[in-house]
């Protein structure tokens, strides 16, 4: 038995093993385009950040579902050769990212200026990035909401209609979850996509 020690909450689910509809749902999304209209705030955020990305001319790293942006800061520190976009749907969480003058996240180094935090809908932002022909060097999905109820499969990134965009963005994918079934399902979805 493997004992994992950490401060993450224990995930409970009515699902044992891979979701029985996983293959069907993933294959459906791989065969059909996601045509939902873009939300205005995400479209505007993309247009603004697209200019910054072009000006930088560096490899692009996504830190999706970044919460308060602590992981984004550390990724930026570890990858000075790249630009990092930390993205979350919650403006409240992002507002808790330390700014100059606040002591937190290892006393933020003000020389780390290769990242931006964005409040966006990832379903839209990832598709916009694909349309703009962006290719990532890395994509971090660190502890996304696992949606552990079996009926919520399509709320998980690998079960959602935007999953093909995650694949098209490319790059080294770093997925972490406190629910092992989430990781196993994501791996199966990648296999179904030929990755």
Identify the role of each PLM range:
Residues 67:
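Conserved glycine-rich SAM-binding loop
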Residues 160-195:
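C-terminal substrate-binding/active-site "lid" region of AdoMet-derived donor-dependent transferases
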Residues 82-85:
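Short beta-strand element of Class I
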Residues 90:
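Conserved SAM/SAH-binding beta-strand->alpha-helix loop
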Residues 97:
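Conserved SAM-binding loop
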Residues 64, 87:
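Conserved beta-strand/loop positions that form the S-adenosyl-L-methionine
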Residues 1-62, 70-78, 101-132:
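S-adenosyl-L-methionine
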């Amino acid at each position: 038995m493997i004992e994992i020690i950490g401060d993450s909450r224990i995930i409970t689910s009515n699902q044992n093993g891979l979701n029985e509809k996983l293959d069907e749902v993933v294959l459906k999304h791989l065969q059909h385009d996601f045509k939902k209209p873009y939300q205005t705030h995400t479209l505007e955020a993309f247009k603004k950040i697209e200019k910054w990305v072009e000006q930088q001319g560096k490899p692009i790293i996504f830190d999706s579902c970044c919460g308060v942006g602590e992981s984004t800061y550390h990724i930026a520190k570890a990858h000075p050769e790249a630009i990092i976009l930390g993205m979350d749907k919650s403006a409240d969480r992002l507002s808790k990212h330390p700014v100059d003058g606040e002591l937190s996240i290892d006393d933020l180094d003000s020389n780390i200026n290769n990242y931006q935090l964005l409040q966006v809908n990832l379903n839209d932002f990832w598709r916009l990035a694909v349309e703009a022909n962006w290719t990532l060097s890395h994509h971090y999905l660190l502890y996304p909401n696992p949606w552990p109820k079996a009926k919520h499969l399509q709320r998980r990134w690998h079960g959602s209609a935007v999953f093909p965009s995650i694949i098209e963005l490319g790059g080294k994918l770093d997925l972490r979850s406190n629910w092992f079934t989430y990781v196993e399902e994501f791996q199966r979805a990648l296999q179904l996509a030929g990755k």
